[in-house]
Structures are given as C-alpha cells and as structure tokens.
C-alpha cells in the first residue's frame, strides 16, 4: 500500500517502475503493431527530403530560402517542400493514433494523451487549466506583436498585411520568429564555429563538454535525421547529442539547448540506483536546456562569445528581447494545440 515503504529511494524506484510498466500492460499483438508502426513512421520521417522542382532539399536549405529569398514563388515552393513530409507520414500517424488510443482504453484511460500524462505523474485537468490560463494571458500581447510583425513583413515584400501568406514567414510552421525588427540576428553567427563557441562557453562555466562533443554527431550529411536530440547512453556519463549545425542563431540556440540536456544527464549523481539515475522529471531537464539555449539571445553572452561591440550591444538588446518575446508567444499557441486536440 502507498506510504508503507519508508525507504525513500526504494519507494521512488517502485513508483518509477510502475509508471514505466503501466502503459505497456496490453495485448502483445497490439503492442507489436504499435512498435512496428512507430518504427515505420520514424524511418519514413527521418529519411524524407522535400523536393523543389524535382530536386531534394534539406531542412536547412529550406530555412535559408525562407529567411533570405525575396521572390514569392520561390518562397512558396520552399514552404510547400517543407510540408511534403506530412503527406508521406500522415496516414501512418493516424493509424498509430488509433492503435495508441485503443491501448489506452484497454487500460481504462480516455485516450493515449491522458494516459501518457498520468504515467508521467501529471494531472490532465491541472495541465489544461495552466495552459488555458496562459492562453488567456497571452492572447492580447500576441495579437499586438503579431500585427507589428505582419506590418514589417508586408513592408519587406511590398504587400498589404492581409495579403501575407504562410511562406512570407521565415519559419515554415510559425513556431518561432527570426525576422522581427530591422536587425539581422544571424549575421553575428555567420562564419563562426558554433561547436567551438559552445565548447568554450560550457567549459567556462565549469561544465566541461569535450567528452560529449567528441562522441556526438553534429553536422548535416545526406540521409541523416535533420533535427536535434540528446541521448544518455548508459546513465554513467556517456551522453551524446545529435545536431545539424549551421552558422546561424537557430542552430546556436539549438546546440546550447541540447548540451544543456547533456550536461544535466552527465552530472546526475552516479551513486543513485540505476532507475533514478536519470532526470527527476522531463520538465526539469527541459527547463535547463531552455535556459542554456536562451543565452544565444542574451547580449552579454553575445559580447563575450561572438565579440559584438558596445554599440552593437546597445542596439541589439531590444531586438533580441522582442525576437525572443514574439517567438515564445508564437510557440505558446503550438503548446496549446495538443490539449485542445486531446479534449476535442
């Protein structure tokens, strides 16, 4: 019974074990279907490359077009290329959703989303309340700053704000913003070695990362997974990251973010039991990673790490803050979508 075990380490291990096993107590045939479907989707998604006029292009190449290209037709082609992967995996994702919901209902949950939160020790009603409140608090600020962004984009392309199309934005999903204001933030990273900047920064705050970087996969190549993640290999300090580095703000932020995850995992107490030798909770490692990634938007960090001068520092302060503010407001809309979907 709950509360009968007084050894806190043992009690916590039992809770962790229960939550890890709980979602898998389903029919083995259904489990096999889910695993096979997940693998099929991952294979299709990871190997997919969108095409522009029949030529395969990487996500980084699409991003460059959406950041720099003035020709609306070329921008539209790049934006549409970024969406082609959806057509390739959508039917399989729908099948997986149905399988997962079937599994969750076998275990007495409303759907897979609710089950995933419950076994991650989060209450769906509390999470929904938090995000509904967040949306209410940010609706007006988002609306105001989005109007400013649209006015800036309309001016750049010589169109009216109401004529703006999705491909006029730099991010194909409008999950973040890099084009807000008159200052080109990417130019401060152009030609810089993002790997070495990251190494210098982390070593400088007494979180050495040479071992992490040595074993990591950091640069783009044909057929490689195009995004980024961190993986704790053995819970004994062998932590690795995957990136597709390019010399811009986005990949500097991402690199710092992933190493944030990695240094968290690397420095967990080694004398803890194996089951507890991982992040205390997902949101803690994520908070650490966000904190570290955000340094790329910090003028003091930029002055120290990429060498901006005092005059640039003064002009950049507001631009970086506004850029970060709008990016967070934009992404907050994405954070709210899964909750609406789960309760639709």
Predicted features, each with a name:
Residues 1-87, 91:
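N-terminal helix-rich structural modules
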Residues 55-60, 94-242, 312-314, 319-320:
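Active-site-proximal, well-structured secondary-structure segments within enzyme catalytic domains
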Residues 78-85, 117, 124-128, 176-187, ...:
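Glycine- and acidic
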Residues 131-141, 279-315:
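Post-HExxH zinc-binding segment in Zn-dependent metallohydrolases
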Residues 203-212, 234-236, 248, 262-274, ...:
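Secondary-structure transition/capping motifs at alpha-helix termini
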Residues 217-226, 276-286:
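Beta-rich nucleic-acid/ligand-interaction surfaces
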Residues 246-269, 286-290:
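Active-site recognition of the HExxH zinc-binding catalytic motif
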Residues 298-344:
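Long, amphipathic alpha-helical stalk/connector segments used for oligomerization, subunit docking
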């Amino acid at each position: 019974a709950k509360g009968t075990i007084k050894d806190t380490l043992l009690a916590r291990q039992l809770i962790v074990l229960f939550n890890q096993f709980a979602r898998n107590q389903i029919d083995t045939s259904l489990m096999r279907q889910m695993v096979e479907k997940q693998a099929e989707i991952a294979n299709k998604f990871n190997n997919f490359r969108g095409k522009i006029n029949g030529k395969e292009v990487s996500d980084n190449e699409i991003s460059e077009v959406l950041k720099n290209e003035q020709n609306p037709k070329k921008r539209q082609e790049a934006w549409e290329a970024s969406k082609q992967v959806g057509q390739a995996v959508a039917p399989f994702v729908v099948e997986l959703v149905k399988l997962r919901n079937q599994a969750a209902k076998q275990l007495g949950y409303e759907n897979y989303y609710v089950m995933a939160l419950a076994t991650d020790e989060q209450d769906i009603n509390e999470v929904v309340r938090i995000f509904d409140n967040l949306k209410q608090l940010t609706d007006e600020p988002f609306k105001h700053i989005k109007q400013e962004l649209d006015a800036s984009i309309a001016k750049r392309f010589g169109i009216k704000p109401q004529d703006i199309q999705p491909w006029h934005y730099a991010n194909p999903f409008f999950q973040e913003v890099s084009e807000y204001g008159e200052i080109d933030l990417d130019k401060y990273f152009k030609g810089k070695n993002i790997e070495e900047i990251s190494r210098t920064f982390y070593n400088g705050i007494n979180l050495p990362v040479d071992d992490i970087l040595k074993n990591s996969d950091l640069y783009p190549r044909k057929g490689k997974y195009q995004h980024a993640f961190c993986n704790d290999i053995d819970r004994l300090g062998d932590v690795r990251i995957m990136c597709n580095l390019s010399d811009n703000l986005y990949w500097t932020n991402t690199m710092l973010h992933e190493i944030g995850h990695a240094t968290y995992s690397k420095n967990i107490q080694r004398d803890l039991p194996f089951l507890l030798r991982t992040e205390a909770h997902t949101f803690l490692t994520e908070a650490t990673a966000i904190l570290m990634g955000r340094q790329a938007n910090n003028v003091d960090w930029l002055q120290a790490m990429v060498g901006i001068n005092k005059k640039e520092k003064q002009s950049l302060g507001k631009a970086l803050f506004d850029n970060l503010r709008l990016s967070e407001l934009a992404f907050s809309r994405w954070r709210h979508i899964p909750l609406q979907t789960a309760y639709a």
